[in-house]
Design a protein with these regions (language model features):
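Surface-exposed peri-terminal alpha-helical interaction modules
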Residues: 1-139
C-alpha cells in the first residue's frame, strides 16, 4: 500500500523489516540481517519485493535495477554509490533526511540496504539467484 501511494520512505522501512523477517527470528530480534542469512531467504519473496518496487516506481527502483547498475560500473561499489545517490562528493548521504523519497531520485536509489556493515549484505541480495535472474545476468 505504501508503494502504491509512492510513500517510498515508509515502504523502505517495511522492506527492511520484511528482510529481517525473512532472515528469521534472530535477525528480527537483533534488528538487522547478516549477509550470510540472505542465501536462506525464499527467492519468491525477494522476487516479489523487487517486482513491487519496480512496478510502483515506474521501473526506476528495485534490487534488480541496483544489480544492473552495479554491473554497468564494472561491479565496483565505489562507483555504484554516487550513481544511485547514496554518496555525493565522497560523503555518504545521511539517512533518512538526505535521501530522496520520490521518483526524482536516481535510478536504483531504493530500496536502501544498510551499508554501515560494508557491502556484503547488499552484495548477497544482488547475487541471490532470484534477483540475478531478474537482471538476466549473475554478478
Amino acid at each position: 500500500l505504501n508503494l502504491l501511494k509512492q510513500n517510498f520512505e515508509e515502504a523502505d522501512r517495511l522492506t527492511s523489516a520484511y528482510l529481517r523477517k525473512l532472515a528469521g527470528k534472530v535477525a528480527e530480534n537483533r534488528g538487522y540481517v547478516f549477509y550470510s542469512e540472505v542465501k536462506n531467504m525464499p527467492g519468491e519473496d525477494l522476487d516479489t519485493i523487487d517486482r513491487l518496487w519496480k512496478i510502483y516506481s515506474q521501473g526506476k527502483f528495485g534490487f534488480s535495477n541496483q544489480a544492473k547498475i552495479l554491473k554497468s560500473v564494472g561491479k565496483r561499489y565505489d562507483l555504484l554509490w554516487p550513481k544511485i545517490g547514496w554518496k555525493k562528493d565522497g560523503i555518504w548521504t545521511r539517512y533518512p533526511s538526505s535521501f530522496c523519497w520520490s521518483l526524482k531520485a536516481p535510478e536504483g536509489h531504493m530500496p536502501l540496504v544498510n551499508q554501515l556493515r560494508g557491502v556484503r549484505l547488499m552484495d548477497s541480495i544482488l547475487r541471490h539467484p532470484s534477483i540475478a535472474k531478474r537482471h538476466e545476468n549473475c554478478l
